[in-house]
Amino acid sequence: NYRKDNLEAPEIMYQPELGKYYLFTSYDPLMTTYNVRVAYSDFPEGPFVDFYGEDIKDTTNNVPILTAPYRFENHPGWAGTAHCGLIDAGDGRYFMVHQGRLSPQNQLMDLHVREVFFTVNGWPVVSPERYAGTAPRSFTKEDLVGEWEIIRIQEPPLERSLEAGQILWGEGDLRNGEQALSARVVLEADGSVGDATWDFNVKKQLLTIKT
């Protein structure tokens, strides 16, 4: 966990329906590739394990990653998307708040709010865009037909020279490859998407793409 010399901002949340404690932590330099990761445990004192069952107290590089620098089209994008807090809305919904820095200079810090959802195997994921207070609704397969932008959140590929866990003075801009960029895909009505196929489970509201 110390491969990039910065690991901080722990936050623990209990999810009573799943009976799990979730530990959210922030990795990497706060102005650039700052990102949130999560692990879970049956007990608040741990041990906490990652997606692959690895104890996060080890020095491996743990996943899953919930937020990392990203950019959709027609927007300059965000960096420094970490240092989170968790909110229990009291009605079965959960939200994550964290900082975000407007690219490309990454100087202006803004507050991001994202809704937290849980996968069928008990892992939290967050909304790809900031929460806008819209009412929840269900979708049909027909609703999803059309062109979409998809972003894959993944490990920042570059290693920086750091000082006290932070980037060196004057190196606050993101470098090539450090920001996840959106790619356009078209979900066709016949269930194809490029060379792959897609399907949508209406009951679970779950989109599946098979390559």
For each predicted feature, which ranges?
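Carbohydrate-active catalytic/glycan-binding domains of CAZyme proteins
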Residues: 1-211
